[in-house]
Amino acid sequence: VTPLDYEFLRKLLKERSGLDLSSDKQYLVESRLIPLARRAGLPGIAELVEKIKGGSDALISEVVEAMTTNETFFFRDKIPFDHLRQTVLPELLTARAGRRALRIWSAASATGQEPYSIAMCLKEMGAALAGWRVEIIATDLSLGVLEKARAGIFSQFEVQRGLPIQMLVKYFTQAGELWQLNADIRAMVQHQQLNLLQDFSHLGTFDVIFCRNVLIYFDGETKAGIFARLAKVLEPDGVLALGAAESVVGISDAFKADPERRGLYRPTPAKTARAGGGASSALKVVASAR
């Protein structure tokens, strides 16, 4: 990829997705966009850029999708899910006993392993959640990964990464070399396309937000804006889970670290003021039909 084409793609990706490519990521652009160019019948990246400049919106969407699809696997990093099971959910069951409703958001959910891991955690609670209204909203910028997530079909390699064998046996059905999540787990998650750069107040408010391993790709200003918007849709006693390499320190004062649980953050009280009701008054968001 030439320096001029690389700079064009950097600006395009920043504007469309917030992805902040450093000056030394040519290898990443080449590894992801050369196959895309060839599928489009083009010799290489130079021709791909030329076609984009000619006004191909469909191709722009494919470029953004190819560059923003990130690695994911079941129960990634394990610790946030341990916190969810052992302390976060039990505390929320007490705090929400009056309205018996929970809303959880998995942002940048990719092919679905994270929201489905959350769903299995909730399913494991059994009778403790009987009679509760539980919503898990999974969002991603990419339509392609959302389609895969909805199907809930995973390869042998995918289910071997992080998924305990007892959960594989309990919640999946094997079909040849593939594994499909059982319908009851799939039904717990609602999938929707969303760009984190845009307003997301229409989602309503949440008790737990997982926004993990995506903010590392944004610059400081973009991160600060996302944190400010996240604070407005998280309940005052809610929990934000970030990735192991992510932090709010030096970026935003909208959240403070939970001193006892690594990777979890609480809204700063002064930053949680917002218009409208809480999660109990939020409209239910249904999976987008396309």
What are the residue ranges of the model-derived segments?
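Conserved AdoMet
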Residues: 1-105
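Residue-level signal for inorganic ion chemistry
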Residues: 84, 209, 234
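Extended basic-aromatic, gly/pro-enriched interface segments that bind polyanionic ligands
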Residues: 107, 127-210, 214-225, 247-249
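Conserved SAM-binding loop of SAM-dependent methyltransferases across substrates and taxa
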Residues: 111-129
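A short glycine-rich, Lys/Arg-flanked "PGG" loop and its adjoining helix->strand segment in the class I
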Residues: 224-236
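Conserved beta-strand signature within the Rossmann-like core of class I S-adenosyl-L-methionine
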Residues: 236-244
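Core SAM-dependent methyltransferase catalytic element
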Residues: 251-290
